[in-house]
């Protein structure tokens, strides 16, 4: 350590960390180093979709650790092949590139869009369109793809090749097919940007424009995928077929893994040497992904989540009706946002004092991300705490 520098932690301070030191997790709960128990409705930022340390995933990881941890992608990996087969069977895509995170998955999508355009002879198609208030990562290219000025501050000049359009704006759709666009990248529900859901007519029109012009439609499912919004992938209820999707977070139930899925004719642009990942789709990560998907795809699992998801939405609406501090309730499934009139941080702090963990989605939105395995009793604990916080912060919860 430098003799002129004194720091309290050797970890770089890239996060404004909450005053909790997590030591254990199980199901919907997290414990700190003092033994305090918290209802964790952050799910590791939409990652622990099966709750903390799910038994089946733990067993799959433990069993794989006995045989092989890592061998690189120079060799065939059976668990990787099996996971890819599952992902393609239950989506409209054909082939998978594995990596370690959401940002890496989106980087892969950006690269394949550029390569596909070159392979097709679309030399003038040098732009990828993304949308205002999007979030696609913090690497060089994914930060540039993220249409939020606060994410860009201090990192200019940004990577070139991205153009931003307003989200859910039908008038701006005419700007997509301008001869320069290789791909459109978007979230069906903008998570970090404030829980904004794509309107069905808008997204279907966008998809039709892309299909007619051979512009790649790429859906970022990092936060919305793996059952988070009620279907395996958030794009599926819209009746569209993206050319590329990206997944991570919930895919490994907290074990690091990411993936970029593409149609076969697009995947062909990634020939040997064009892209790679040392650890991507390693045997342990793939085992975690297989176990996760098997649970979520099991008979009745997603259907059984619907009652709790509807209950959460209805209860949040009822709190809004009696609290002048709540402006709107947004989201789908177990990806919900409460837009408040004051600062979201005030709600988050009050809830933490009541042993409930939630997240911000911007300055004015409280983000609630229960695990898909949460119970009715746990949901009621959260709802009751929200009612109490609304009252404490000035809401009229007496009707």
From Swiss-Prot:
Gene Ontology biological process terms in this record: L-arginine biosynthetic process
CDD domains: OAT_like
Free-text cofactor note: Binds 1 pyridoxal phosphate per subunit.
Record's subcellular location: Cytoplasm
EC annotation from Swiss-Prot or TrEMBL: 2.6.1.11
Cofactors, names only: pyridoxal 5'-phosphate
Pfam families per the UniProt record, alphabetical: Aminotran_3 (PF00202)
Keywords from the UniProt entry: Amino-acid biosynthesis, Aminotransferase, Arginine biosynthesis, Cytoplasm, Pyridoxal phosphate, Transferase
InterPro entries, per database record: AcOrn/SuccOrn_fam, Aminotrans_3, Aminotrans_3_PPA_site, Class-III_PLP-dep_AT, PyrdxlP-dep_Trfase, PyrdxlP-dep_Trfase_major, PyrdxlP-dep_Trfase_small
Top-level enzyme category: transferase
Binding-site list for pyridoxal 5'-phosphate: 102-103, 135, 220-223, 278
Catalytic activity: N(2)-acetyl-L-ornithine + 2-oxoglutarate = N-acetyl-L-glutamate 5-semialdehyde + L-glutamate
UniProt superkingdom: Bacteria
Pathway: Amino-acid biosynthesis; L-arginine biosynthesis; N(2)-acetyl-L-ornithine from L-glutamate: step 4/4
Modified residues (N6-(pyridoxal phosphate)lysine): 249
Residues reported to bind N(2)-acetyl-L-ornithine: 138, 277
Listed Gene3D superfamilies: Aspartate Aminotransferase, domain 1, Type I PLP-dependent aspartate aminotransferase-like (Major domain)
Additional notes on this entry: May also have succinyldiaminopimelate aminotransferase activity, thus carrying out the corresponding step in lysine biosynthesis.
PANTHER family documented for this protein: ACETYLORNITHINE AMINOTRANSFERASE, MITOCHONDRIAL, AMINOTRANSFERASE CLASS III
Subunit text: Homodimer.
Family from the record: Belongs to the class-III pyridoxal-phosphate-dependent aminotransferase family. ArgD subfamily.
Protein name: Acetylornithine aminotransferase
Source organism per UniProt: Oceanobacillus iheyensis (strain DSM 14371 / CIP 107618 / JCM 11309 / KCTC 3954 / HTE831)
């Amino acid at each position: 350590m430098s003799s002129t520098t004194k720091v309290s932690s050797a970890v770089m301070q890239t996060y404004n960390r909450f005053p909790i030191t997590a030591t254990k997790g199980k199901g919907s709960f997290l414990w700190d180093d003092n033994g305090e128990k918290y209802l964790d409705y952050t799910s590791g930022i939409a990652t622990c979709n099966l709750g903390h340390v799910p038994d089946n995933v733990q067993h799959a990881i433990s069993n794989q650790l006995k045989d092989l941890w890592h061998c690189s992608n120079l060799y065939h990996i059976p668990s990787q092949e099996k996971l890819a087969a599952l992902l393609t069977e239950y989506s409209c895509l054909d082939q998978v590139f594995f990596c370690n995170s959401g940002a890496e998955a989106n980087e892969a999508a950006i690269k394949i869009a550029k390569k596909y355009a070159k392979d097709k002879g679309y030399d003038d198609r040098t732009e990828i369109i993304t949308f205002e208030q999007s979030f696609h990562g913090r690497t060089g290219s994914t930060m540039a793809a993220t249409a939020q000025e606060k994410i860009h501050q201090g990192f200019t000049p940004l990577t070139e090749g991205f153009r931003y359009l307003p989200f859910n704006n039908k008038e701006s759709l005419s700007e997509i097919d301008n001869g320069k666009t290789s791909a459109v990248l978007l979230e069906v529900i903008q998570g970090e940007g404030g829980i904004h859901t794509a309107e069905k007519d808008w997204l279907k029109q966008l998809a039709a424009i892309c299909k007619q012009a051979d512009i790649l439609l790429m859906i970022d499912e990092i936060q919305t995928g793996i059952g988070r919004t009620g279907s395996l992938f958030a794009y599926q209820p819209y009746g569209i077929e993206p050319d590329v999707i990206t997944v991570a977070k919930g895919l490994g139930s907290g074990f690091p893994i990411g993936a970029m899925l593409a149609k076969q004719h697009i995947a062909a642009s990634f020939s040997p040497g064009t892209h790679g990942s040392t650890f991507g789709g390693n045997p342990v990560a793939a085992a975690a992904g297989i176990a996760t998907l098997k649970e979520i795809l099991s008979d009745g699992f997603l259907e059984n989540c619907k009652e709790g998801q509807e209950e959460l939405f209805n209860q949040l609406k009822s709190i809004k009706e009696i609290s002048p501090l709540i402006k709107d309730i947004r989201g789908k499934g177990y990806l919900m946002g409460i837009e408040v009139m004051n600062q979201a941080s005030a709600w988050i702090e009050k809830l933490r004092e009541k042993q409930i963990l939630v997240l911000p989605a911007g300055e004015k939105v409280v983000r609630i991300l229960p695990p898909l395995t949460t119970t009715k009793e746990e949901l009621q604990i959260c709802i009751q705490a929200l009612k109490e916080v609304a009252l404490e912060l000035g809401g009229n919860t007496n009707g």
